[in-house]
Amino acid sequence: MELEAFYPHPALVTKTTPVEKPRFPAIDAHNHLGDEFGGGWIHRPLAVLLDMLDASDIRLYVDLDGSWSEAALQEHLEHLGPASDRFRVFGGVDWSQWTEKGDKFAEWVASRLRVQKGYGAAGLKVWKISGCTSTIIEANW
């Protein structure tokens, strides 16, 4: 028999346990609502998202997509604002400014993070790739 003609038939029989609802409430501590990783939930009605979270008994949702830019942070905070008790949105650092800011980069980042906190950011998302691609050529910190 040629491999392309081989279609195995499952023979294992196990007990099926339908799960109607979650056993415990949950916090989704790492997720995305934006287009890049989150399926564009940020553009869908908030009520639809809340219904889905309620069905899964997710009590709190941490959205990391505010870290793309301050504009994205503000968009996410505005969209989720009516249910702000259910969401935490993280901000981020614009690493592209490192070269331009030079020795002032750390001070600049601290000032931007204070601004983001003022917008309502609940934390800071540091992308893994940042540590792999950002390097200090010369700094006097």
Place the predicted regions along the sequence by residue:
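Active-site gating/metal-coordination segments in enzymes
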Residues: 1-4, 8, 72-141
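An N-terminally biased module of ancient metal coordination in phosphate/nucleic-acid-related enzymes
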Residues: 1-82
